[in-house]
A protein has these predicted regions:
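N-terminal organellar transit peptides
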Residues: 1-117, 121, 137-139, 150-260
């Protein structure tokens, strides 16, 4: 191969690297600009969409540690005496991270209310976050999904309820139980208890009445449905959740979610 060809290839590679670097920084600049704009408008977004040029708080694909940390950073900069707007468009993620965000919302002591906006969907951990807010604004076609925690291995995902039920069934029928399943069932029991206590916390702080809180736990957290079960805005209202149904999102929210 001639020196000229090698030089040409190296030049192309360097050009691509520079182009990628510039693109990455352009996205970062745009995100920073959006974040500053949203802070001024008392908005936090948790948006996980491959179609969106506006990445979530830090570019996570699901709710994770980075989302949690960036949420807290954004929350600390907001005006607590005005209503805080949280835009949710996510399939969920890590329970611990979603729970940490929920605790931040539950511990809010400012005069302003915390309002969740769901233009399309908010599943699992995203639904948990919505339920922690003072009210939820949804379009008539927007949906929520169950919040029951999931266990997974390399090939399959299980609800914690199914892990517990499977182990109990095997015990009752004197069937051999793999050590892995025993360990998972113990972890699942602790996780289920943790989610029950989370709902009780929302009840005790006056977020829900005991009756409504029990219904919410049964429908969203108990694992009685498949994890892909959907709850419409009307279903949510029927459960006693403070949901406002709108034909379209407020202009302030639409400006941010237009590219989802």
């Amino acid at each position: 191969m001639s020196f000229g060809i090698i030089t040409g290839i190296l030049g192309s590679v360097v050009g691509l690297v520079i182009l990628a670097y510039c693109f990455k920084n352009a996205i970062k600049f745009k995100n920073n600009w959006y974040q500053k704009k949203m802070i001024k408008q008392n908005i936090i977004s948790i948006i996980h969409s491959s179609n969106s040029s506006l990445l979530s708080l830090a570019g996570d694909n699901t709710i994770g540690l980075t989302t949690h940390i960036e949420f807290i950073k954004s929350y600390d900069k907001l005006n607590k005496d005005k209503d805080i707007h949280i835009i949710l468009h996510t399939t969920g993620g890590a329970l611990s991270s979603a729970e940490a965000i929920c605790n931040c919302i539950a511990n809010h002591t400012g005069v302003g209310k915390i309002i969740a906006y769901i233009p399309y969907y908010s599943y699992s951990g995203g639904c948990m976050i919505a339920l922690a807010c003072d009210s939820i604004v949804m379009t008539k076609n927007a949906i929520l999904g169950p919040c029951d925690a999931q266990k997974s291995n390399f090939t399959t995902q299980y609800s914690i309820a199914s892990v517990i039920d499977t182990v109990n069934y095997k015990k009752q029928n004197n069937e051999k139980i793999k050590e892995e399943w025993l360990a998972n069932s113990y972890d699942a029991i602790l996780c289920k208890d943790r989610q029950r206590k989370y709902v009780e916390k929302l009840i005790q702080c006056g977020h829900f009445t005991q009756d409504i809180g029990d219904k919410i736990y049964e429908e969203f957290f108990s694992g009685k449905y498949n994890h892909d079960k959907i709850f419409s805005s009307a279903d949510s209202i029927n459960l006693g959740i403070n949901v406002q149904i709108v034909d379209e999102m407020p202009e302030l929210i639409k400006n941010i979610t237009s590219d989802i």
